[in-house]
């Protein structure tokens, strides 16, 4: 049996408490870590260990890569993955090695990364839970990464030496206690801060996978001279950083005057070749696809399904942070729409492999100025119509013709999902409200929070539902929008929750008068 590969005392999990913090705390802190012994594909023990609880002492001349090489197992890897057409018809035999440079199926459709689920199923859910838990908080290469700690489910065949990682992932799952209670009447609201990452957005999760595979392809002498992407900001930041780390040239197509300066400076600082093009994201996307068809530049946009393999680990991580309890709702901002499918894929793999018994309902939240999925949903999933996106403060999702529309629709149908939208005023107000309770979120998270407000008001999400809002980028990338909001400088917007600074003379009496007015006349009485 596969479970014979896991040596671990049988300890029952503590019963969940009503207090969200107690429910959230991992019981793994109260038990011994497992010792994982390497197994053949049929579950029989073999001599060489994959991981052991006790490792040889660290040699001072080793870095973590050297140490990983020295401790490398000679065990046969039973896991594999390949490209297949997305949502292929039953009986389809079309497939491609991950070492091939291919982005579309023969019919022109999207590709997906398909894992050998039968090989993965030879090990039960308890095995995978304990293996993933045993890697948390470690510096062992490459498992200290929140992505590569799930390597067997991501790129199982890549050599550790080819991996390009900043130990991304492992991002904070924040209990939004005050915000939930004050504004929504909720006691179990969480924000998954994927923007607390190497380059400040969730795109790092996918880019570590894609650039690692490119690193492998280049070592195999495949024709890849660089990696290119079209971007609304965050993709280019992640691509340029990971390529710089590996010494791989990066080429970035950006829509002129449509991203924040904080986003623009990241690829420039990391040495990318940046083209500022007089078009929108959809125009940049069209150009990069045409260019990569003619030049040996590897395409890094989410048309490439490798990125979704890294992004799906955020879903697995949420379950792990809840000690493998499933939340009721997960709300994800959507632009190019790969991320909503990635989250679905992560949750679904956990269900299929026995780590959990169900998946959450998901919500995709769009800006009203760039809402083709929302309109498609409201039409009853009738014929999808691309649109020309208007300017939105949520610039990273200002996309009118999303590449992953089919993936998003598939995921939402499978999880009984919902699509909501947010106007500019709604998303900025939601961002300000969240910030006033101790967060510092991006406008895209404001879109997701607006969706939550609407679904709470409609009674769709109950006050006791455990709900996770996915925050996709760091608020520090979008400070100008916050400055404009709190300065009441946005035309035709009331900025109801603005908090502008108060000008006051450098005089003791003047300062005292202002403070008494703010705090109440009796507060400062001696």
Swiss-Prot record:
Name recorded for this polypeptide: Threonine synthase 1, chloroplastic
Function: Catalyzes the gamma-elimination of phosphate from L-phosphohomoserine and the beta-addition of water to produce L-threonine.
Gene Ontology biological-process annotations: threonine biosynthetic process
Residue span of the annotated presequence: 1-40
Species whose genome carries this gene: Arabidopsis thaliana
Matching PROSITE patterns: DEHYDRATASE_SER_THR
Keyword set includes Ligase: no
Gene name tied to this protein: TS1
Binding site for pyridoxal 5'-phosphate: 335-339, 472
Keyword S-adenosyl-L-methionine: yes
Superkingdom as given in the UniProt entry: Eukaryota
Subunit structure and binding partners: Homodimer.
Cofactor: pyridoxal 5'-phosphate
A Gene Ontology molecular function term of the record: pyridoxal phosphate binding
Miscellaneous notes: Binds 4 S-adenosyl-L-methionine (SAM) molecules per dimer. Although SAM3 and SAM4 have equivalent positions, their interactions with the protein are not identical. SAM3 interacts with Lys-181 and Asn-187 of monomer B, whereas SAM4 interacts only with Lys-181 of monomer A.
Catalytic reaction list: O-phospho-L-homoserine + H2O = L-threonine + phosphate
